[in-house]
A protein has these predicted regions:
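Alpha-amylase-like alpha-glycosidases and glucanotransferases acting on alpha-linked glucans and related
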Residues: 1-58, 115-118
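Carbohydrate-interacting/catalytic domains
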Residues: 40-41, 55-60, 66-179
């Protein structure tokens, strides 16, 4: 469960955003445009949430935060899209990085797997100062789960608040509070 660097993309492989389109290929067979077609930014954001909340050091390959696509080398080394960045993805990265910075348990806390199921994963990061439960639903519909957050130190009388919610059409930083 320990890793040194949490990478979704790097200079040796196709970019993670491209991999969300489920196309395996190279530019010489499919063309560079195919790397950008059918991408799933919701899945990309789910990956970034795991990257930023898992143990280890999250490492962003330049351009991932701006929505750069690309098949395997050399296509994955496209230039940074100065002035044409995906502003929603940039904002998302800034917000999730801020959450990591503001919540020590996401940087140095213990990790505990919670409830997991088909297209669903949940785990907790916690220390003596705080607890975060991370729930990722990759289904195409809402699901209901009972998560035993007491396992990560949330008191039975405690409250939890959704601080980030990602959807197909974007994300929001406002959420409901649960008891």
């Amino acid at each position: 469960w320990q890793v040194a660097m949490n990478e979704l993309s790097n200079h040796d492989h196709s970019r993670f955003l491209t991999r969300t389109n489920h196309k395996v290929g190279r530019t010489n067979t499919l063309g560079p445009q195919a790397a950008e077609q059918g991408i799933n930014k919701a899945v990309f954001r789910e990956g970034v949430v795991i990257q930023m909340t898992w143990t280890g050091a999250p490492t962003i390959y330049y351009g991932d935060e701006a929505g750069v696509c690309g098949f395997t080398d050399p296509d994955n080394r496209r230039t940074y899209p100065w002035g044409h960045e995906d502003q929603v993805l940039l904002s998302f990265h800034k917000d999730i990085i801020r959450l990591r910075r503001e919540n020590e348990e996401l940087r140095t806390g213990s990790l505990k797997m919670l409830e997991n199921d088909y297209n669903f994963i949940s785990y907790g990061r916690f220390n003596r100062k705080g607890q975060c439960a991370i729930l990722i639903n990759n289904n195409n519909h809402p699901i209901t789960k009972e998560i035993h957050v007491w396992e990560i130190g949330v008191p039975k009388t405690g409250k939890m608040k959704v601080i980030l919610q990602s959807r197909d059409d974007g994300y929001c930083m406002e959420g409901a509070e649960y008891e």
